[in-house]
Amino acid sequence: MHPYMRRSPNLVVLSGPSGVGKDAMLNRMRLDGASVHFTVTATTRQIRVNEREGIDYIFLSQEKFAEKRDRNDFLECALVYGNWYGVPKRQVTDAFDRGLDVLVKIDVQGAATIKRLAPQAVLVFVAPPSIHELERRLRWRLTESEESLALRTETARREMEHLPAFDYVIVNDALEEAVRQLVCIVAAERCRIPPRVVRL
């Protein structure tokens, strides 16, 4: 078999401002039965209404998270808006062993860290149609104070400046179309010549 025919699993990193719709996109892909592994991020923040332990996030105490961080159990971890978030390394390596592509949802800072650790990772930025629309979505969530809303909006403006570091951008103006584009990116990367080879 030609070396290019031996496909290695891809590490696809989905990033973008808070409230842009990353979770909605991944949930739709799950419902549609996408043949990828969706990592579940560990966090120290409080669980929100309708979130499920082990499905939306792995909720840990500060102490437990620190233990795992000290053992180097995370592919990447960072303090975001006062809470720790980390991608469990074991989830990624186990999925790779099964030949599955891996989708990681992470903040822009974390995406840059993963790209340094795994230069062959595929970085996808999800952008809002406008900052005004992003602010509207954050207000609709009813989880943010005015102070938090202002901070997240300003952070989003700064994060948009990192777009050139990404491989793809999806403007999430309509959920179905945004999901279709993400599915197409994953499919296209599977056909890439030469294939990406991710080493962790």
Task: List the predicted regions and their residue ranges.
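NTP-dependent small-molecule kinase module
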Residues: T143-E144, R158-L200
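Post-Walker A alpha-helix
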Residues: M25-L26
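ATP-dependent small-molecule kinase phosphotransfer cores
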Residues: T43-V102, V108-A112
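P-loop (Walker A) phosphate-binding loop of NTP-binding proteins
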Residues: S15-P17
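Post-Walker A helix-loop "phosphate-sensing" segment adjacent to the P-loop in P-loop NTPases
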Residues: R30-T39
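Conserved lysine of the Walker
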Residues: K22
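Extreme N-terminal, non-catalytic leader segments
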Residues: M1-L11, A34
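Conserved phosphate-donor/acceptor-positioning beta-strand/loop module used by diverse small-molecule
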Residues: V102-D107, R116-R141
